[in-house]
């Protein structure tokens, strides 16, 4: 008992068992090695040089970018089947460690690394849990003159400050749809906050969007600028769209065009979310309001964009004019903050208490 049998047949069987075990271990080892070897998009299953080139041309040049894409997107840009696109995305997610479950305590630690940009107003910062968050879309809506664009100008200056002063040492991308960006106002805010106005202007990249298609294209081009500045001392940390819905509203009129408009707006918001999460930037969008003829009580206005925008924005803030030239900000929706209000002023410093 316990001794190895001298029977040749038994020895042979034992040897085969050991051989199969070794082969099994070798296959497992090779499989693990193969999984670890996915470093570039060419390493993904089904991605050859031609497909890789098409993906790169469309902006999908990293595993992370592919991991957060949709199968339909890859199908269109690479000319592959939806099934093949899904396999590529799943492999990219696994390689980039995206789309997997995480313990809540680990997720809490991850959220602690989220950056926040001061608005310039302590009361508004407190309402927003410390400022405008990175990895999120903050929507601010209100009537003309409520302070939406003034807040955007202030944030474009504040984000360039060091973290201890309320900034993120970052650059800004500004997509202007209504010709409301004013470099003169940036200079004024920067000067009154003790900054070099010329240096501040150098780190704001502005593009005018002339229609909704152009607006969506500029978001894609914004990613190129984000990548270009990624490893510099002033990476992009804030993307502003002022205003988000004006072109969509003017181009798609009537109930017959509503479905197409909302579908297009949903795609636009998905692209903004992808940039916010992939590059850890804050996305700040302004929105207009429209009258509610059926409202007999309460506020007679509502933001444009419907349920698509309501569910896509991480935080929603309603601005209105208050007494004595002051402005009132009301936090309408946030996943981690209670509703509340903050009062601020618009001065030569931009937004302040």
Curated annotation (Swiss-Prot):
SUPFAM superfamilies: P-loop containing nucleoside triphosphate hydrolases, Rad51 N-terminal domain-like
Name the record gives this protein: DNA repair and recombination protein RadA
HAMAP family linked to this entry: RadA_arch
Pfam families: HHH_5 (PF14520), Rad51 (PF08423)
Organism of this sequence: Pyrococcus abyssi (strain GE5 / Orsay)
Family, per entry: Belongs to the eukaryotic RecA-like protein family.
GO terms (BP aspect): DNA recombination; DNA repair
Purpose of the protein: Involved in DNA repair and in homologous recombination. Binds and assemble on single-stranded DNA to form a nucleoprotein filament. Hydrolyzes ATP in a ssDNA-dependent manner and promotes DNA strand exchange between homologous DNA molecules.
Residues that bind ATP: 142-149
GO MF entry, a single one: damaged DNA binding
Keywords: ATP-binding, DNA damage, DNA recombination, DNA-binding, Nucleotide-binding
Family matches, as PROSITE patterns: RECA_2, RECA_3
Gene3D superfamilies membership: 5' to 3' exonuclease, C-terminal subdomain (1.10.150.20), P-loop containing nucleotide triphosphate hydrolases (3.40.50.300)
């Amino acid at each position: 008992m316990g001794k190895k049998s001298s029977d040749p047949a038994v020895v042979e069987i034992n040897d085969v068992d050991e051989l199969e075990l070794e082969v099994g271990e070798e296959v497992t080892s090779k499989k693990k090695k193969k999984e670890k070897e996915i470093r570039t998009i060419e390493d993904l299953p089904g991605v050859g040089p031609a497909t890789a080139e098409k993906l790169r041309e469309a902006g999908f040049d990293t595993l992370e970018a592919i991991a957060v894409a949709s199968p339909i997107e890859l199908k269109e840009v690479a000319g592959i089947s939806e099934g093949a696109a899904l396999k590529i995305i799943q492999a990219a997610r696994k390689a980039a460690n995206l789309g997997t479950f995480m313990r809540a305590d680990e997720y809490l630690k991850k959220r602690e690394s989220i950056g926040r940009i001061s608005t310039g107003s302590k009361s508004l910062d407190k309402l927003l849990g410390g400022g405008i968050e990175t990895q999120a879309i903050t929507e601010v809506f209100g009537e003309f003159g409520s302070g939406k664009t003034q807040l955007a100008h202030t944030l474009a200056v504040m984000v360039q400050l060091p973290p201890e002063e309320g900034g993120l040492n970052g650059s800004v991308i500004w997509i202007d749809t209504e010709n409301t960006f004013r470099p003169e106002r940036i200079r004024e805010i920067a000067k009154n906050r003790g900054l070099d106005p010329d240096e501040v202007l150098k780190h704001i990249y502005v593009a005018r969007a002339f229609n909704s298609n152009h607006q969506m294209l500029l978001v894609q081009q914004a990613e190129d600028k984000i990548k270009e500045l990624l490893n510099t001392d002033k990476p992009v940390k804030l993307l502003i769209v002022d205003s988000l819905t004006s072109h969509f509203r003017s181009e798609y009129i009537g109930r017959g065009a509503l479905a197409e408009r909302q579908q297009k707006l949903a795609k636009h918001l998905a692209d903004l979310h992808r940039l916010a999460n992939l590059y850890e930037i804050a996305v700040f969008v302004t929105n207009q309001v429209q009258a509610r003829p059926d409202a007999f009580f309460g506020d007679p206005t509502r933001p444009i964009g419907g349920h698509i925008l309501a569910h896509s924005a991480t935080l929603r803030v309603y601005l209105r004019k208050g007494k004595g030239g002051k402005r009132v900000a009301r936090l309408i929706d946030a996943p981690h903050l209670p509703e509340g209000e903050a009062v601020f002023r618009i001065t030569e410093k931009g937004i302040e208490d």
